[in-house]
């Protein structure tokens, strides 16, 4: 796995680990599990820490030849947003949020819910293949 540089002398991977640990509840555990699945699906994934603003500490991002997905936590949900999710086949129907747009798709996970690891890794691999191909238009086959 590769890392991009980050701020305050910490690597992006260190910032991601720290932010997940600081959550201290099911959200951090869920994001840590999904992070592990991302790394299993693509050992060459690049972890980044982006969009740091005064009102936001930043967002964990996973990339490979372009953005794959972001991981965010809110009070009652963990959200994984795939930047080109509308172009990915999702036979397991993991995408359950941001379904109306032409580009992004997201997976919202609530406390107690589990994500099918095999199906999730398949989405990661598809996203990497799509980024590597240079294609950005949604395929008609991927829509459901």
Residue ranges of predicted features:
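Charge-dense, helix-prone N-terminal extensions
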Residues: 1-144
């Amino acid at each position: 796995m590769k890392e991009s540089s980050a701020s305050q002398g910490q690597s992006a991977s260190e910032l991601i680990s720290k932010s997940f640990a600081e959550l201290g509840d099911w959200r951090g555990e869920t994001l840590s599990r999904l992070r592990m699945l991302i790394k299993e699906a693509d050992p060459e994934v690049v972890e980044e820490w982006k969009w740091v603003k005064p009102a936001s500490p930043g967002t964990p991002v996973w990339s490979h030849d372009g953005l794959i997905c972001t991981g965010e936590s809110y009070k009652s949900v963990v959200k994984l947003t795939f930047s080109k999710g509308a172009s990915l086949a999702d036979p397991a129907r993991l995408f359950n949020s941001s379904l109306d747009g032409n580009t992004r798709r997201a997976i919202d996970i609530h406390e107690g819910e589990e994500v099918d690891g095999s199906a999730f890794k398949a989405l990661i691999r598809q996203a990497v293949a799509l980024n590597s191909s240079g294609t950005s238009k949604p395929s008609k086959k991927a829509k459901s």
